[in-house]
Amino acid sequence: MTILNHTLGFPRVGLRRELKKAQESYWAGNSTREELLTVGRELRARHWDQQKQAGIDLLPVGDFAWYDHVLTTSLLLGNVPPRHQNKDGSVDIDTLFRIGRGRAPTGEPAAAAEMTKWFNTNYHYMVPEFVKGQQFKLTWTQLLEEVDEALALGHNVKPVLLGPVTYLWLGKVKGEQFDRLSLLNDILPVYQQVLAELAKRGIEWVQIDEPALVLELPQAWLDAYKPAYDALQGQVKLLLTTYFEGVTPNLDTITALPVQGLHVDLVHGKDDVVELHKRLPSDWLLSAGLINGRNVWRADLTEKYAQIKDIVGKRDLWVASSCSLLHSPIDLSVETRLDAEVKSWFAFALQKCHELALLRDALNSGDTAALAEWSAPIQARRHSTRVHNPAVEKRLAAITAQDSQRANVYEVRAEAQRARFKLPAWPTTTIGSFPQTTEIRTLRLDFKKGNLDANNYRTGIAEHIKQAIVEQERLGLDVLVHGEAERNDMVEYFGEHLDGFVFTQNGWVQSYGSRCVKPPIVIGDISRPAPITVEWAKYAQSLTDKPVKGMLTGPVTILCWSFPREDVSRETIAKQIALALRDEVADLEAAGIGIIQIDEPALREGLPLRRSDWDAYLQWGVEAFRINAAVAKDDTQIHTHMCYCEFNDIMDSIAALDADVITIETSRSDMELLESFEEFDYPNEIGPGVYDIHSPNVPSVEWIEALLKKAAKRIPAERLWVNPDCGLKTRGWPETRAALANMVQAAQNLRRG
């Protein structure tokens, strides 16, 4: 029984973000469709070859996506919302981009599809839309074309397909309500057709992803798996693939399915591999997800070997990444600025492939010498002085309940804030960032590369901040922001100014579409050596009589959007960040900043996948936010911002944050999210986002007014704010001015009644 290895997927964007650059060039009309398609082909060929060279036996094909793999699946099934369809019924790459972005080089602009987080990761997918009586047919053959490409290059191919039940689970019903699970029998013939086409190509194994099987699914959804897979069996071998959690709670459902193998995440799940082996059918292959696909730490391969060795030789076995390597940067070897000791603690996607090769070889041969050598640096890290800061640990241990309480309740604070700010009804503001122009990015890059001295850099940033203030005053906004010209990324910026983080040069991972992020890495205890945001906030406030918000990224979001340590709990990391940023709130307040926004867009996405684990997470997540904010005086208004959220199931926790104002992303869901706040009778102020900043389309005054009137039916108008869905960093100035002018006009119209 020779053990093989494989990955569940590989990063798509390219080491130098080649895909991002090609996408954005095409969208801007600066390159042709054929040039874009060529970049995709080159990247796929390179990535297959890199995995093969690193020692991977079975290469994933179908993990590449032009925007998002769930959206690719929608096109495969012919699930194109009517507003995005071509007049002749055809489907092309611009159809895909219109669904994702709201517009493309061809076709009519229309509202983009809703976007939300992929399980509990920092990746986003485009939510499939379902309508009653919907028809499905094989429409988009990207998977088959890519399989042909890989076969022509001589690769050992394992196609990757998002499974039918998970696909339906991830979607939403539009229009007349019905049970979307009722569409299962309608999509299965398309899956059968795809599997038949793969069988014709001589494919032996297909990786069929059903990550919904790690969730606490309703019984009807669990019951749907058996008939679905009865319909899909027989053409190729199916590797039922799960990740992000364990499968033990749903194992009875899984073992009844007519599949030939099961992949389990042995990093994030608590499944005992020996127990799994006992319960799985003896003729099934087990794919053991031993290498963490969503972090950057080098694996202790001696531990991984010990975890799996007891079942070696007892069944067919593959070793694999826990999930797709999509969530990891590509290659550690190009990081030239990392300290050698710290660098030795990491492994990116290609290094993880090498780890899988080492592990496979050791399991096949019984020789573990190479594993011990590989694991030595990560074992040595446990004793490094760069990891532990006694002062931070002491401060954390001394936290009391009082540290997470504002001095007075919201009603008392609101009165003090009204007296201080004297804002009009329907106050207007933005979420924080303004367009990051080429000039701004060049300025930061020149400074970072040493081509610009500190004085000239500061002068340049000050000019951009001044421009942002002038623009906002001209537009008539009520509460201003400084625009964040100095910030490359809302998490990276804070990480750069906090001890305990390190940064990469090329550690990019895809967030959605062409958007990539370069997460900081938490390597040790976190503290704040000096104020971070105070200087620029104070400068911006000196330029205007209107209030300027101080802008902080909250502790849970910094945690969720960084690569965390694996040797302490997430709670510990979050509270260390909260204590550091608590000092920042106090310093902003002392500098005369009266409104401070602590962004927590990631609060909900950090939820464990199983509801039974939610309470513990929400308890410490809320406490971290309150530790961060509670130092503020009554007349300092604390805002928070959240996006991509469904709130109804965590409203108690949202209210427990005790922010004076919460701004939320609601435009894509047509104010749906406000139902939760209405039903809960949310007591504080709310700014429901009135337009979608992810789309370049400019909303009309009438559209915004209609949304605000809809909001006012749910929330008393005196507690409503008017703002976009999110920061404006990715937009250009022309559409930003136009959209904000319409937003301000809508608010003014409502004030006049």
Curated annotation (Swiss-Prot):
Q: Where does Zn(2+) bind?
A: H641, C643, E665, C726
Active site residues of this protein = H694 (proton donor)
A single MF term (Gene Ontology): zinc ion binding
The alphabetized UniProt keywords are: Amino-acid biosynthesis, Metal-binding, Methionine biosynthesis, Methyltransferase, Repeat, Transferase, Zinc
Q: Which cofactor does it need?
A: Zn(2+)
Query: Which EC number applies?
Result: 2.1.1.14
Binding sites annotated in the UniProt record for 5-methyltetrahydropteroyltri-L-glutamate: R17, E18, L19, K20, K117, R515, C516, W561, E605
**A GO BP entry:** methionine biosynthetic process
Q: Which domain of life is it from?
A: Bacteria
Cross-referenced SUPFAM superfamilies, in alphabetical order? UROD/MetE-like
Quote the cofactor binding remark.
Binds 1 zinc ion per subunit.
Gene3D superfamilies xrefs: 3.20.20.210
Q: Which residues participate in L-methionine binding?
A: I431, G432, S433, E484, D599
Q: What catalytic activity is recorded?
A: 5-methyltetrahydropteroyltri-L-glutamate + L-homocysteine = tetrahydropteroyltri-L-glutamate + L-methionine
Q: Does the keyword Zinc apply?
A: yes
Q: Where does L-homocysteine bind?
A: I431, G432, S433, E484, D599
* Similarity field: Belongs to the vitamin-B12 independent methionine synthase family.
Q: What does this protein do?
A: Catalyzes the transfer of a methyl group from 5-methyltetrahydrofolate to homocysteine resulting in methionine formation.
* PANTHER family, per the entry: 5-METHYLTETRAHYDROPTEROYLTRIGLUTAMATE--HOMOCYSTEINE METHYLTRANSFERASE
Entry-linked HAMAP family: Meth_synth (MF_00172)
**Name of the featured protein:** 5-methyltetrahydropteroyltriglutamate--homocysteine methyltransferase
Q: Which organism encodes this protein? A: Escherichia coli O8 (strain IAI1)
